[in-house]
């Protein structure tokens, strides 16, 4: 097909150990060639195709995880994107659990990335959905943390496992002492809350 799933590795910084991967969709367009998510995801969010794309990615990732498991890599997690449209779908929990059960995988092998901006749309419903997903065993990651919105308030209310820092937030860290201090504060806060931290870039 025109869509493929690529895996971007995640490394543990203290020992450079491969700790997992992030699944990213790529579109090989017949006219325009290889397109990155930034070039087509906004369009898919508008026309509703994003839910079909996400489900395709989830299925492909679970299929790959099962193949890796058979080769002895049973503790290798993969992060997948969950769009705002998916989050507010009434059957997302049932759909995700059915996919991991189909491939006989533990839910914690699938890390679900939810953007920080999703919190501002309907925080009450989002918290309910995320709580249900965590109860089922999925690992919840907040993507693009620090990109704005009510970051600290969200941390106080959202049942999450991982903070994924926004790239702009990290890049600006090198510019000014104040920004470095803010970054260190966020990392220290995450540690106190027993959250893992992922830095993009």
Language-model segment annotations:
Residues 1-43, 81, 142, 199:
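Active-site core of bacterial EAL-family cyclic-dinucleotide phosphodiesterase domains
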Residues 13-22, 49-126, 200-201:
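Catalytic core of bacterial c-di-GMP phosphodiesterases, primarily the EAL and HD-GYP domains
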Residues 19, 36, 91-93, 122-126, ...:
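Residues at alpha-helix caps and immediate loop-helix transition turns in enzyme cores, especially N-
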Residues 53-56, 179-185:
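Conserved acetyl-CoA-binding loop-helix of GNAT-fold acetyltransferases
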Residues 97-173, 185-201:
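The catalytic core of metal-dependent phosphodiesterases that act on cyclic dinucleotides
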Residues 2, 48-49:
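Catalytic-site/binding-pocket detector for metal-dependent nucleotidyl cyclases
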Residues 38-42, 51, 127, 131, ...:
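Conserved long alpha-helical elements within nucleotide-processing catalytic cores of c-di-GMP signaling
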């Amino acid at each position: 097909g025109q869509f493929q799933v690529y895996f971007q590795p995640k490394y543990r910084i203290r020992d450079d150990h491969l700790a997992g991967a992030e699944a990213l969709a790529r579109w090989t367009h017949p006219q325009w060639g290889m397109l990155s998510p930034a070039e087509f995801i906004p369009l898919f969010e508008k026309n509703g195709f994003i839910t079909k794309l996400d489900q395709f990615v989830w299925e492909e990732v679970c299929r790959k995880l099962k193949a890796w498991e058979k080769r002895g890599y049973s503790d290798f997690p993969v992060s997948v994107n969950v769009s705002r449209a998916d989050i507010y779908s009434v059957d997302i929990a049932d759909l995700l659990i059915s996919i991991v059960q189909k491939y006989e995988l533990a839910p914690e092998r699938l890390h679900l990335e939810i953007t920080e901006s999703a919190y501002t749309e309907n925080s009450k419903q989002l918290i309910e959905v995320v709580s249900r997903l965590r109860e089922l065993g999925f690992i919840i990651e907040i993507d693009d943390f620090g990109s704005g919105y009510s970051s600290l308030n969200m941390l106080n209310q959202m049942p999450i496992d991982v903070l994924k820092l926004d790239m702009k937030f990290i890049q600006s860290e090198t510019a000014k002492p104040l920004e470095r201090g803010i970054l260190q504060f966020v990392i220290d806060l995450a540690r106190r809350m027993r959250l893992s931290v992922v830095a993009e870039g």
